[in-house]
Structures are given as structure tokens and as C-alpha cells.
């Protein structure tokens, strides 16, 4: 039998353990059925379940400032009432956050209500998800349908997005435009693993950042796997990017690097590896340094350097009216490239390529 003294000692030890517990251990699991309740109660929860939430018009599902270690689960169908505004529909920040989707869940943006074929012009359309300051965190297994405009805006360090499905296929016939899947900027350490995307703009667009890995992606119907446009922003450096083991089909481009005319910056340590393309309407591989006001001018400048670029096992076919490969560099600004097993066929050969390293073919 335990003595009173030993029981007292045990109780004091337990109290000390509780007193020293981290905040997340003291918090509980919460289920929210409204966006307002989630915003008001998020700080007191170690696990947040978002249960069939209908987000009011013009309102962000605000999960910013989450306590470190919080788990977020999307359950049922998440919907958003209609208003013409900039968004985002969802915003999340914090450290060591784990975001998942429960079995059978759907985040249905019903973007057709906004689509008018004009993208960032025309009706004001909300962006979908801001992962700004969502550091050392993960987003896994989300099923997303019909974003009004861009899907994920990533500005975070050490973030991993895995098994994300973005199905904007309806936008092909209903006026979806500028529905980028993953826009990455001002980030260090971004991993995007096994995404499935059907959209009407870039599957991946990296405007700035370092240590970025995109692997095992399926990209359908958009503008391909892009770096840029680089230049003209507060951060104009893209470094150490690997894009690999992915397919790009029925898209405008497959592999693309573009920089802004007259700007400064750098693109370096870039690898595209094991990329398979089909049904490409514009360019299989395009690297150009002539963008101005969002459009190519045909007049490249050399203020943004593109160095240490490796293309290996980049293969597939483009449409007969498309161009296999187009390389337009400024004087001396493209260097130290490696090309190995780059085989793009089916389209035209460009006669306008300029200033590209001799190891490449155009």
C-alpha cells in the first residue's frame, strides 16, 4: 500500500509536469462549423476540425497566427459565398502546423461564379489560399475544386505540400483564366510532392526563392512548369530549384523560364529532370529574357542572369503549330548550361533563338 507521503510526492510531481507542459498540451480539440467561430476560438485548440463550413461572402477563413504545433483538418464540404473581392478565401500562418483533409472532404470554391475569361481583369476575383508565414509546416491531401483565380500563394520557409489535388477542369469551357496552382515567392525550403493539377495557368510559378523541390507532379491544361517572370520585384533571386519526375499535358508550355526586360536579378542552380510533355500548344521548352508588362517583346536584355541550368531527360511532343524549343537570351547572360537527353518533337524549329549556350539546341 502506498504511504500518504509517497502519494503526496507523486501528486506534486504530476502538478509540476502539468505546470511545465507546453501550451499545446494544455489545449483541446475543437470542431468549428462557422468561419467566425474558427477565427475566434483558434488559439485555444491543439486540433482544429473545420466541419462543413460555409464561409460568408467577402470573408477570409482566417487561420493566421496559429499556435505552434496546431493540427488543422478540413472535413465535409467547405464552401464560399459569392462576392467580387480580392480574397484570399483562406489564409493560414504559424509554425509547425499540420494541415490535412479528412476522407471524402472537398474544398469547393465554385469559381465559375467569377469566371469571365479575363482572369485578373474583368470581375474582381479572390485568390484561394495564402500560405504566408506558414513555416516548418505541412499541407497534405487537400481536394480543391474550381478556384476563382490563383490557388496557393506560398511565402513560407520549410513548407511541404503533398498530394494536393486542384481540379479546375471546368474552367476549360467556363472561362477560367489565371488559375495558377502554386505561386512561390520569398520562400526558402518549399517542397511540392505529387500534386495533381488541371488548370488554366502555370502549374508551378516561382518568382523568387531558394531550395525549392517539385516532384511527381501531374499538370494538365495550363501553362506548364515555370520560373518567373523574375525581375522587377523586391526579391529577384531564384536559386537551387529541382523540378522532376512530372508530366505536362494539353498545356501552352511544358518547361519555361522567363525574366523581365531591363530588370536585374539572377536565376541559378536550376534542374528540370525527367519531364514528359504531350499536347503542348506553344513551346515545349522556352527560356526568354524579354518580358515587359507581362508580355514578350522579342528584345532580350541581360540584367537577370540565367546560370547553371540543367535539363536532363526532358522529352515528348508538341502540336504541329507549336515550337519545339525557343531560347532567347541577352548578351552573355545565359551561361553554364547542361543539356542531356532533351528530345522535343512534333512542332516547328525556331529561327529566332539568340545568345544561348552552345550545349543547348534550338
UniProtKB/Swiss-Prot annotation:
Record-level GO BP terms: cell wall organization; pectin catabolic process
EC number: 3.2.1.15
One Gene Ontology CC term in the entry: extracellular region
Disulfide bonds: 30-45, 203-219, 329-334, 353-362
Active site: 201 (proton donor), 223
SMART domains: PbH1 (SM00710)
Residue stretches in coiled coil: none
Any one Gene Ontology molecular-function term assigned to this protein's record: polygalacturonase activity
Positions of the pro-segment in this chain: 22-27
Catalyzed reactions: (1,4-alpha-D-galacturonosyl)n+m + H2O = (1,4-alpha-D-galacturonosyl)n + (1,4-alpha-D-galacturonosyl)m
InterPro entries from the UniProt entry: Glyco_hydro_28, Glycosyl_hydrlase_28, PbH1, Pectin_lyas_fold, Pectin_lyase_fold/virulence
Record localization: Secreted
Signal peptide: 1-21
SUPFAM superfamilies (alphabetical): Pectin lyase-like
Stated family: Belongs to the glycosyl hydrolase 28 family.
Record's function text: Involved in maceration and soft-rotting of plant tissue. Hydrolyzes the 1,4-alpha glycosidic bonds of de-esterified pectate in the smooth region of the plant cell wall.
The protein's name: Endopolygalacturonase II
Species: Aspergillus tubingensis
Gene encoding the protein: pgaII
